[in-house]
Amino acid sequence: MDPAWKTGDVQTQTWEGRAGPADYRLEVPALGSFPPFERFWREQARRLIRGLRSMGGPWPVELHASFQETRRDDAALSGFWDISRRTGHAGWDLSRVTATFLPGSGSPQPLPVLFYPGRQRRLPPLVQREVLGLRQRGECLLFRDCGARCLRELDPWRYYLTGEGLAVFYPQEVLGPRSAGLPTVLIPFDRMEGQLRFPF
């Protein structure tokens, strides 16, 4: 394990208040375990608050962000922020921010870094298979062309790691209607054997 990383459950703090027309409540990691990881999320929170202060308009805004650490071990430190935002009496807009730190890295790493050169091209078909499986099993209401959409919209920053595999997600209304939320698929590590540079 990176000597700067400490094991154990992540501790969070709640930042709440008002900025511009918005009431916000944000969960951020507390300082003390791995400063670059914590600084990243705190800067995301400050940026979000600055954006709220610059907003105009007559409607009140509510914004909540909940933090989830998904992996912390010898191989990676990974987590995400789920953000819910509502303007006036409209429905909630959902978004997600993720970050994965690898040993020796002081900043979040994009998806291609996980793979040996040239091996990442094997990932899109695995993601597509899982997305189509979601639709066929009825686990998530997705558009008929979700298989093509998931390939076009695969993004190097929309992922996080768990103990079981690589989770890839898509923004609201990209693969399905608003009610589908943030479609997420998990690719087990054993399906990527020989492709990954790190011993996940």
Predicted regions span which residues?
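Compositionally biased intrinsically disordered regions enriched in Thr/Gly
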Residues: 1-200
